[in-house]
Each structure stands twice: as C-alpha cells, then as structure tokens.
C-alpha cells in the first residue's frame, strides 16, 4: 500500500549554497570502463512527528542532495530501490535525457515501490528487459512464495556496450527485510537465473543481509563475486552501507552489494559516503564499482588459414 503523500515534497528545500561543487566518489568514466552504482533511495514516507530522524527522512529535505549526488556521479548504470513513481520521475529528471529507465512496481497492478535500472544510452543500448517477482511464479505480478509479507522483485536488462561491442546483463533487486527464508530462496532464484545467462553479468541491490550471510554465500557460490572483495582498490575504509542518516560508519553491515561475474576486472569498488551540503540523501549509502569486461571486438580472431590438401 502506498503511504499518504508527503505534501512537503511540493516545495523542495534548497540543499544550500555551494552544494553544486559535489566531489563524486567515482564520477563519469570512459571506455572500456563502466561505472555501476546501486542505491536504496528510501521511499517517501508519511511524516510522523517526534520520531528520530523525522526531519532527515523528509523527501523534500533529501531530494536536492540526492539530485546533486547522482548528477555528479553520472554512472553508466544506476540501480535504485524503494522508489515510488514520483520519486523515480524526479531522479530521471536529474539524470537527464541521455538516460533511460526500465523497471516496474512490485504490486499486482505493477504500481507501488519499484526497483529500476537507469541506463546511460550514450554508452549502452538496451536490447531487452524484464521484471521478475521473487517467487515460485516469477512472471506473475505481485506474487509471493517465500515467506515475505510484501512482494519482492528484480529487473533484468540486456545491454550492448556501444564502445566495446560486448553484450552484458544487469540485474537490480531488493530482498525482504524481515524473512531470512525469503532472502535465501530469493538468492537461489537469482543465482539460478544468472547462471543461465550468456555473457557478462552484474547483480546489484539492497539485499537486507550482510556479507557472509546465507543469501550472500548462495549468490557468490556460482559465477558471481563481490566486487568490493576483488577490486584493485577499495573506495571505503570498511564502511557499512546503512548509516541511517548519520555519517558513514566503519564496521557497519554492508547490506547493499554489487556482484559481477568472475570474468570482470574490477578497478575500484566500495561504499560512497558523499553528503552534499552535509545532507544524507538516504538512510543507505550507495555502492559503486568501476568494471570492465573483455571487448567483444578484441576477442574476435581472424580465421586460421589452412592450406588446401592436395
């Protein structure tokens, strides 16, 4: 059920003077690298007076900072979780017309909270996309099977890299926050799905479980590895990804992951702690990875010449 509208969202507050000088964690990258970014942007909630973080949680307080952050980062692919339709439209506006979003709401009518992929179409062409419900009937909107009280989804896009000729698959998801059984079964479903894909794969999202959890172990026992664990450079000193509107915290749980197939080279990866104007754009922090896969063009070899037999 969609919560009542936060009427304060109609008049967004300014993030403050000088905030246009945001220093990104990664920022735009050139070929053959791709900048992948996953971010739980925290759904717009009705305001409950007197609750902790009530002011920090206001969408009207967070939106200007969130816009500045994603405008500075401009990833090749941005996976978002928890966005309501109006929030998705505002983020798409911040990214501009070079980006195309694919995704759907999790509910039976395909409305409500969504996971989405925002793709930079100057670099990547969307070949196809689909929504999957994390259930025994993945093609049935709103379906639930694993013990979660609300539907959970994933979105898969097949992309052509216009710079390298490679074709890759990107999946974004949001696992259940209450049921460990649901998370485990969802991980099995996604691992089975991605193991069957042909070509490079990235899986990103909010998994509501830490590194080393059953869900993480299940997803990384196939073709996928955790980008932060294999990166040449780590972008954070050991931060968790759920800071709950506070500063980034060393030793916190990393609930948000960015997984890639073992054939990828990960230049750098980690949690971003940018606070435009001192404002935390969400209760989660984004996770980034700079990744490159072998070029399809480089892999092509001329046919070996064999002299005809006499």
Report residues per predicted region.
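Metal-dependent phosphoester/phosphodiester hydrolase catalytic core
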Residues: 46-47, 162-184
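Metal-dependent phosphoester-hydrolase catalytic domains
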Residues: 3-6, 10-26, 123, 181, ...
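Solvent-exposed loop/turn segments at secondary-structure junctions
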Residues: 41-43, 84-86, 107-109, 124, ...
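Structured beta-strand-rich core segments of catalytic domains in phosphoester-bond hydrolases
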Residues: 15-28, 33, 77-167, 270-272
């Amino acid at each position: 059920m969609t919560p009542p509208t936060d009427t304060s969202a109609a008049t967004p507050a300014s993030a403050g003077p000088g905030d246009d000088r945001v220093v990104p964690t990664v920022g735009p990258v050139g070929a053959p690298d791709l900048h992948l970014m996953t971010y739980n942007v925290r759904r717009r909630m009705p305001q409950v007076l007197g609750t902790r973080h009530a002011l920090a949680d206001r969408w009207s307080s967070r939106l200007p900072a969130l816009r500045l952050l994603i405008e500075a980062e401009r990833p090749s692919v941005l996976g978002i979780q928890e966005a309501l339709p109006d929030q998705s439209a505002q983020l798409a506006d911040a990214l501009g017309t070079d980006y195309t979003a694919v995704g759907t709401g999790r509910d039976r009518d395909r409305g409500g909270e969504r996971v989405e992929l925002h793709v930079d179409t100057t670099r990547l062409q969307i070949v196809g996309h689909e929504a999957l419900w994390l259930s025994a009937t993945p093609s049935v909107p709103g379906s639930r099977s694993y013990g979660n009280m609300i539907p959970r989804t994933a979105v898969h896009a097949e992309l052509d890299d216009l710079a390298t000729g490679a074709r890759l698959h990107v999946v974004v998801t949001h696992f259940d926050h209450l049921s460990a059984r649901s998370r485990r079964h969802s991980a099995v479903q996604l691992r089975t799905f991605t193991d069957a894909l042909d070509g490079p794969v990235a899986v990103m999202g909010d998994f509501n479980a830490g590194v080393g959890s059953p869900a993480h172990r299940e997803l990384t026992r196939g073709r996928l590895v955790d980008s932060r664990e294999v990166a040449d450079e780590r972008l954070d000193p050991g931060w968790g990804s759920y800071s709950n509107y506070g500063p980034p915290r060393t030793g916190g749980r990393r609930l948000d992951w960015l997984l890639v197939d073992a054939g990828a080279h990960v230049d750098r990866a980690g949690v971003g702690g940018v606070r435009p104007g001192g404002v935390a754009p969400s209760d989660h922090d984004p996770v980034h990875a700079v990744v490159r896969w072998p070029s399809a063009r480089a892999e092509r070899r001329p046919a070996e010449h064999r002299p005809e037999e006499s």
